[in-house]
Amino acid sequence: MESSVATHWLSAFVILCSFITTQSLNNKIHEHMTIDELRNVFHVEHHSRVPEYHLVQLTHHLARRNIPTSHPANSNSADSGKTPHLKTEKVTKGGYKAPSLLNDEMFVEAKKRIEDVDIMGDPNSTVSVDFKVQSSEFGDSESLSDKEHSAESQEDGVHKIDLEAFGRQLKLVLKKQEGLIKKDGLKVWKALKNETQPHGVDYEEMITEDDEEFGDLYQDEENGAALLIRRHPKHGKLVVEGSIGHDLVIRPIPDTMTSPAQDDEMFMDPSSMADMVSIDTGLPIMKRKKEEQDRLQEALNGAQHVIIKRDPAEVDHMSDYAFMEPDHIGKRYRRKRSAEAHNRQKREAPYVIYPEILVIVDYDGYRLHGGDNVQIKRYFVSFWNGVDLRYKLLKGPRIRISIAGIIISRGRDATPYLERNRVGRDAIDSAAALTDMGKYLFRERRLPVYDIAVAITKLDMCRRQYANDACNRGTAGFAYVGGACVVNKRLEKVNSVAIIEDTGGFSGIIVAAHEVGHLLGAVHDGSPPPSYLGGPGAEKCRWEDGFIMSDLRHTEKGFRWSPCSVQSFHHFLNGDTATCLYNSPHEDDSLPRVLPGRLLTLDAQCRKDRGTSACFKDERVCAQLFCFDAGSGYCVAYRPAAEGSPCGDGQYCINGQCITEHENIIPDYSQHTPSYVRPETSPFYANITSSRH
């Protein structure tokens, strides 16, 4: 009897010790990650820099009585003998809740009443997941309570998630998004140093994974959630990544941690690894201990994601902007408005405008994401989904972000405009880099058509008040006010450019929205407009109110646009210099049988549109026809030249390309940057305005 009791208590003690050990492991799961895993999940390269996070496991259910009879989930029922896609799961943070502590009878009863279905397979389904938080000595512990999930949504692609994390209750209503990526898919290029190519850089289009593997984009406007959701190709579970609100990020846990240990699984990081082993190359590598991998599996308990809380210091950054020319030039050109231009009927902005963004990822950003092209694509699509979400809050004008393409830099020399302006090891002079970027893009004609080019860097951005001053850090973004679609011909510089800093974890989303706002004509709240744009400015809106065009984004207003910003957008988008934003990136213009460009010269087309002449008569007109506007002094891109328009010696515009007559059309994406021209502008450094602190 005594022996039996002793055995019982000994067993209980062993179980308790095992539970506590697993709890501790769960609370510090990041300490068992390799450097590559840290970089993949948290975008940091040292365990001490990992932010606060929760381990999360997602579950999706539909009530059986509400499942449409035509839904394929019916074939996954218990009667069919097929295994459903997903299983009932729970959420943990800090502490681990052993399966033995669950109410088995409640689990069995719930399993009888509900049925797992494929959230991606049913666009009409409504999904609800409830996360509840309770305290433990290891931190907050979250458990999942199953709720009734129905297919009551009447709108395709709407899914609901109820969750409580970091003391906040969130009810996400996620709607599937279209339009950020073009119908023919997202184009991605890699940029490499090559002295034989123009500007010493070679651009090569990359073949990436199909859209099904890539996933679908979802947004919740009210809660500021922008997510990319896909199915894992092996086990079929949902993989979710993106941003929630201004400080939460959800990321998947690497497969190397969620998969059982394999004999051929090798790691270079020495933390929690076995002794070094040798392979044929003679180089030492490290292998994670099987016992360690098993403990990770037990601690994760099937969790596939982490919710990360960003440091507020990473959210609130200063922003700078530059004016495009001195004030007196803008006034003079407004006085020169000709009677012909004044009487010409103005083209009003459409109900929806589509800024097409060319995303340029520098080499440090490439390394930040582990050099994984697929992950880089997913991250930055999720990133711009978050930026687009901020513009979705505008009810008028309606602005829909579209990605023209992504360029991934495979070396520092692939972005020479950044490299030439390095300050020390980890910073760049933002004003000088922006100027050089504009000049580089003016000469570069191998890139896809775009309205705005944005370089994204992990490097710290700094500013000099004067040429030889110290470069003061703290800036996170830099752009020209009203620069969208604009080129300075005298200085040979594109003004439709911006540089933003992003250190991972979607820290640069609001900064990107802010800088694109500058390019679309908005100034900082509390500031007057530049004279060359005119309009309402933002003097009536206080900087301290903390809207997007302020740097004091400490409340929910940091997701919204001030009334002054909205008025500035209206003014800019209805001006003569914004017409390149009017075309939809998804228009499918079929080739007409009679080519109108053979009937009207480029000058004749401009006379009909602007009453003036064409600014350029080379291959650029196939992407955008620039016509001189006497009223503003700019060359304005109204639309592409008509099909069949001449674009060089014996060459004509066909499907947006300048080709020799009867030549086969082979896509090479060599169209020139959409741009405007304004003569007699002054050098950039004479017109820099800093943000308010």
Swiss-Prot record:
Q: Which cofactor does it need?
A: Zn(2+)
Residue sites binding Zn(2+) per the record: H514, H518, H524
Name the cystine pairs: C485-C580, C541-C564
What is a GO molecular function of this protein?
metalloendopeptidase activity
The UniProt annotation puts motif Metal-binding at: 514-525
Q: Ranges for the Peptidase M12B domain? A: 353-585
Pfam families, A to Z: ADAMTS_CR_2, Reprolysin_3
Its annotated function is as follows: Involved in larval molting and metamorphosis. May degrade extracellular matrix (ECM) and basement membrane (BM) during the development of organs to allow degeneration and remodeling of tissues.
Compartment(s) where it occurs, according to its Swiss-Prot or TrEMBL record: Secreted, Extracellular space, Extracellular matrix
**Family matches, as InterPro entries:** ADAMTS_CR_2 (IPR041645), MetalloPept_cat_dom_sf (IPR024079), Peptidase_M12B (IPR001590), ZnMc_salivary_gland_MPs (IPR034030)
Give GO BP annotations, semicolon-separated: instar larval development; membrane protein ectodomain proteolysis; metamorphosis; molting cycle process; pupation
Please provide, in alphabetical order, the Gene Ontology terms of the cellular component aspect for this entry: extracellular region
Quote the protein name from its UniProt record: A disintegrin and metalloproteinase with thrombospondin motifs like
Q: How is the cofactor bound?
A: Binds 1 zinc ion per subunit.
Q: Which gene encodes it?
A: ADAMTS-L
Segments carrying the region annotation (Disordered) are: 67-91
- Biased composition range(s): Polar residues: 67-80
Residues making up the signal peptide according to the UniProt record: 1-24
| Swiss-Prot/TrEMBL induction comment | Expression is induced in epidermis during the 4th ecdysis, pupal ecdysis, pupal stage and eclosion. Induced by 20-hydroxyecdysone in the cultured wing imaginal disks, but not in fat bodies, of day 5 fifth larval instar.
Q: Which UniProt keywords apply?
A: Disulfide bond, Extracellular matrix, Glycoprotein, Hydrolase, Metal-binding, Metalloprotease, Protease, Secreted, Signal, Zinc
> Is the keyword Hydrolase assigned to this protein?
yes
From which organism does this entry originate? Answer: Bombyx mori (Silk moth)
Question: Which EC number(s) does the record attach to this protein?
Answer: 3.4.24.-
What domain of life does the native source organism fall in?
Answer: Eukaryota
Q: Which residues are glycosylated?
A: N124, N194, N687
Tell me yes or no: is Phosphoprotein among this UniProt entry's keywords. no
Q: Which residues does the entry assign to the active site, renumbered to this chain?
A: E515
- Top-rank EC class of the record's enzyme: hydrolase
